[in-house]
């Protein structure tokens, strides 16, 4: 381990901090905190280099078990890579084993050492050096293990994890995957950390199992623009053999580092005991958190002994806000009525190829893309999601409905309910300090549970969060819903068969899922369920269905017309995702499994405010033409924009049309704009072939506010496919060299001017050189990858070494007249935390896919230049062919 820590420090010297911060770089918590320098608390990534076996393996917990033939993986790991169409239970369910070899560094001696698995799917057992240290049931919450006395020094240690994602009715969610509307996937699919600190320390709330306690608990009261009370609790344990006397310090810093408050609390902790420090900050003129201004303070907590030495400490990002649900008066934020319905979407975290084994950066990018689209609330479907996603929502201003795991299943066995109750307690303990938490949803999704269960779950949330601004929601159809302050239902101004029949003035209402519209719950045909590659017509219908269909239905427009008592709704669903009980994925996302946008995404974007602000997410005016100018494109041209006016121009010197937004304040902020009977392919043909004015054919939309053009979007017909384009979809975030992080690189088929050719059926093969690897191979159609709606994405993962990565993309079957290859170079940056692994083990991590068909040779600069010159020569030769075809073709 020593040499790996040294490499980490050397890397920081070669990649200075200022280079890493050219753009905003998100940071992610570890076990609920952010590391604080010189605190005596260190965080090590345990993600690299685990040996993996799919299936049963008798005796695999033993230190001397022979695992030399096992596959080498790094965490997060989802057991297997899957195709983009991975529904219908094609994924593996069953036992798996992981084994990690390492030798702990001497500097860890004498410290408390905790293994923190953010989640392990299914039921699991954790062994260290052959000893069973813990057993866990459930796949979405932390598994924390005290390994202080389990390690051996100056020799090889083995952590062995057994996990099983098989159908099991004894713990939630419990529903068998073949009758489940999502997919469990499997493995150790989130991060694993080793937390090291001194024997006097701030505890982990998910390890301590103390009601409304353990760790750090930050809550608020009397929040307003002028002042706020910040209620502080810190649970301190003394595992040393001496009495401890000292202080707990709380330092509150504004985002710019300015100290906003400081106080301390004297503590005394006897050996083997724990105490809770309680204090309160009275803050004047607080910078309040909201979706529009998600201001985060840094709360630094330190334990000092009587000599002033720092014994333990860490940093926590907090947002000061109040949330109140006031029945007929609706939702109030920070002491004021919130001015509009909160509209957002549900989110499963699964991603193309990797399933649920998603890198932290992807969680941040997901949140960023949703916030860019103007969404303000996300419902975690149907489980606590990765801590990295919660961190991102804090930073980007997304409210979150936090769900306990559960979906249409109840088991009368007492152990089942107890495990549900345990999950609720642990999700509150894990997420209680996040300002993004809007509602707790402790009931089981769409489940016929006993009536007393609803009361019990509400009581548990209130026990675990006994402070102001804590609210829970429940389905209006569920047994026992009467005790809940927030009920989920459809609004009365939509489909009246779905809406609640009478409103209680004391209750606040919200639509937890809207937008899906199946013909029946077996076929699952719906105008909302549209694969991106089905093209313009299908995507236009989906976007209109979500915006304002011509039939009674809960849609964006309807939700904007509700009384204050109905406070918004979450679309089902943000992204396409995999399912167990149906052969088709859910295609109803506004983005696909790679997070490539459909037209509906831009419809959502058009609903955000046109006011430009300095934020981490996109703000300001926008305009988007939902039309590709193909021979099959509709005559009507659809545009999405949040501007007051939109001017559409068809061709250079051609006609223009102007749309003016209605003055009414009712309904969705920006209705879908349709310019009727505009596009004509024959006009394109006439301009292009007969008049030789291809460059003058286009659609141009200009967004206008106060008479000024503030946003534009131009679309041109894609001509002959000439080349590939490559770009990285990273939201300007760095690729971290931690062996786990990955980024989406997109190849597109384009004409000579870079216009994407949406209609083609090529395959693209990728080759990577340097410090990166491709995730997935030909066996799952990841590499080579089919081109869908003009693009073929691939996932590029970092290695453990920062450095350059070169990606080459070519069409699978190359020829002198096929599109030219493209090259893209990336550079991975140093990881945020040092690693623990054995060098010889890490060297066995595969650098390429195990599918030989997916391997393409790298192209040298000279080969690429030859390709370019050949394309130029061919273009000249083709001009003669084109002329002769024109001479013998139609003249009129």
Question: Where do the language-model regions lie?
Answer:
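Substrate-binding/catalytic cleft of secreted carbohydrate-active enzymes
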Residues: 364-369, 377-600, 621-626
